[in-house]
Amino acid sequence: MTGQHADIAPATGPRIVVLVGGVGGARFLQGVRELLPDAEVSAIVNVGDDVWMHGLRICPDLDTCMYTLGGGIDTERGWGRVGETWHAKEELAAYHAKPDWFGLGDRDLATHLIRTEMLRAGYPLSAVTEALCNRWQPGVKLIPATDDRCETHVVVTDPENPGERRAIHFQEWWVRYRANVETHGFATIGADEAKPAPNVIDLIESADAVLLAPSNPVVSIGAILAVPGIRGALRTTRAKVIGVSGVIDGKPLRGMADECLSVIGVETTAEAVGRHYGARSATGILDGWLIHTTDTAEVPGVEVRSVPLLMTDPPTTAEIVREALDLAGVKW
């Protein structure tokens, strides 16, 4: 299960790096692949959502990208396997196994079993991901932001002990509580000791363009930036860094970006998110910022362009990518 991605031929196009989360990031990558089938595309994927459940290592964003690009995703839900069954979940419930709020599908379970077996055998997550992708042939290189533990936890008022605060895993905050609990902040556990996965920094530094997918700016892109060295590489790369807004008309395209932004005191607008990322000419990471045609934004030091941002299908998404690369000055 080792070796190079068989589906990635020697690149003849530009070298593109994309920072991505789960559903939105995966759909954006479909557009990148649609537009640039011969390019060297490397996706640096959020691992802040990763969690141990029932003795297995779950990597939601890596799996969503892998299944989406490999044709195995449940397109109606946007996550998990198509044709999924839930017998293992039912059996765990019969045993009163905890936690009972996080379901693992039968098909999905196989991925987690293989991943956990390889991790326990000593393989780093990046090598495990490469091995899993040999089956799915995603057409882009999927790389975890780090091989180390770097999990997003959420500081909340303890629902069971009012008046007391405690930190819970992001999955519990979102899946169990649906963010409907008094929330005080986010913490990235392990970030102080984490290192970028192999080649991540080199890929950013040698890229022709770096794109920030329209993923959650706090717990997806933000969690990637929490890995020491990645933000610095974005600030010094020779490539232009172009972000794509995941907020349209004051609402996230999907997911809970509004809930997360509220916690850190950022408005749910394209302008506010662009300012949150900031300009590379100051202390931020952006050179350019794509917003939807119905939005307006002024981000000091950042070139803002209004284009249609609804990712209805890969060809439509490819046009978003085209605009991002044009803003980056990349020709192919």
From Swiss-Prot:
Record keywords: Magnesium, Transferase
GO molecular function, one term: magnesium ion binding
Pfam hit, one: CofD
Gene3D superfamilies according to UniProt: CofD-like domain, CofD-like domains
Enzyme Commission numbers on file: 2.7.8.28
Keyword Transferase: yes
Cofactor(s), names only, from the UniProt record: Mg(2+)
BP GO terms, sorted: F420-0 metabolic process
Residue spans crossing the bilayer: none
Binding sites annotated in the UniProt record for 7,8-didemethyl-8-hydroxy-5-deazariboflavin: D63
Catalytically driven reaction(s): enolpyruvoyl-2-diphospho-5'-guanosine + 7,8-didemethyl-8-hydroxy-5-deazariboflavin = dehydro coenzyme F420-0 + GMP + H(+)
Biological or metabolic pathway of the protein: Cofactor biosynthesis; coenzyme F420 biosynthesis
Protein task: Catalyzes the transfer of the phosphoenolpyruvate moiety from enoylpyruvoyl-2-diphospho-5'-guanosine (EPPG) to 7,8-didemethyl-8-hydroxy-5-deazariboflavin (FO) with the formation of dehydro coenzyme F420-0 and GMP.
Family: Belongs to the CofD family.
Quaternary organization: Homodimer.
Protein name: Phosphoenolpyruvate transferase
Species in which this protein is naturally found: Nocardia farcinica (strain IFM 10152)
